[in-house]
Amino acid sequence: MTDYLHSPLHAEHEKLGATFTPFGPWEMPLKYDNELEEHRAVRNAAGLFDLSHMGEIWVNGPDAAEFLSYCFISNLTTLKEGKAKYSMICAEDGGIIDDLITYRLEETKFLVVPNAGNADTVWDALNERAEGFDVDLKNESRDVAMIAVQGPKALEILVPLVEDTKQQAVMDLPYYAAMTGKVARKYAFICRTGYTGEDGFELIVYNSDAPELWEELLKAGEEYGIKPCGLAARDSLRLEAGMPLYGNELTRDITPVEAGMSRAFAKKEQDFVGAEVLRQRAEEGPQAVITGLVSSQRRAARAGSEVYVGENKVGTVTSGQPSPTLGHPVALALIDTAAGLEPGAAVEVDIRGKRYPFEVSALPFYKRDK
């Protein structure tokens, strides 16, 4: 029997009747009741997510910005205090180790948030690359919890719980920015980020404070129709928003060039791990790119389904399912650039031995009203 890691909110999930699923070394909520209702709650009102399985790594010191710029494909020296940046950490051969978000709290203080399944790998990579840099690394992945409130009502739910002197600052906080403050009397790192395609916030708090904050957010959101949401809804939401998932769209066999992230290092002058390979790959152009597919049929493509134009295989589906918001199947696929497919182009997807018509689509599939 596998001994899974549990979130500090595990007892809260049990009280809410959650169905659990393994996620890397963790056991996390898959859903609470109906994943479609959870999905729709986020699109129409708000959803509450436990993201405590995500990693949290602090990077402090005079060389912190230069160090992270060496480790990641993006230039972190230009990131302003209080802002966040989406980036990737790669191996020497350009393969993606993880995609992650980095926050700059102060001139020499950064927080790196890697994906749950890659947190230990990222921690090891940062330590291996730290030689020669004046930095201090601290892994708090097991010491803190992350709770996300996402959806069009997220701001209305969160603000009344924020300490009076910080409420206006939270209301004015731009997307991909962060600040500190008390939420429900608990010290929190408040980030206006998310993985759903909606407005929302991700709150990092000490493990001991997480259960009370979770309960306070549920209580505050009750009048708005907030629902606790599991990983199933999180996956369908991010797919509609065209956001990649590590292990599906992003792997060690994919480089940021195929993932559409060449712009992150296009003007970067500093050296970074994988730079030589990635700059050459970017100059040559990707052999395949992550592409959106849609269908008017009911049958959804799944990861591993092959994509065809006539008798020629042109790609493989990396993620796919029916879209609860749009009412038809959507998918992401790694498509050969040689096929020359533009939005609107017709393809076929082999689903259990039978081919179904799909169409190439621009991304994202869903975009919220601002």
Curated annotation (Swiss-Prot):
Keywords: Aminotransferase, Transferase
GO annotation (BP), single: glycine decarboxylation via glycine cleavage system
Origin superkingdom: Bacteria
A Gene Ontology term for the protein's cellular component: cytosol
Quaternary structure and interacting proteins, as annotated: The glycine cleavage system is composed of four proteins: P, T, L and H.
HAMAP family found in the cross-reference section: GcvT
Presence of keyword Cell wall biogenesis/degradation: no
InterPro entries: GCS_T, GCS_T_bac, GCST_C, GCV_T_N, GcvT/YgfZ/DmdA, GcvT/YgfZ_C, TrmE/GcvT_dom1
GO terms for MF: aminomethyltransferase activity; transaminase activity
Gene3D superfamilies assigned to the protein according to its UniProt record, in alphabetical order: Aminomethyltransferase beta-barrel domains, Aminomethyltransferase fragment, Probable tRNA modification gtpase trme, domain 1
Reaction(s) this enzyme catalyzes, per UniProt: N(6)-[(R)-S(8)-aminomethyldihydrolipoyl]-L-lysyl-[protein] + (6S)-5,6,7,8-tetrahydrofolate = N(6)-[(R)-dihydrolipoyl]-L-lysyl-[protein] + (6R)-5,10-methylene-5,6,7,8-tetrahydrofolate + NH4(+)
EC number: 2.1.2.10
Protein's job: The glycine cleavage system catalyzes the degradation of glycine.
Full protein name: Aminomethyltransferase
Family under the similarity heading: Belongs to the GcvT family.
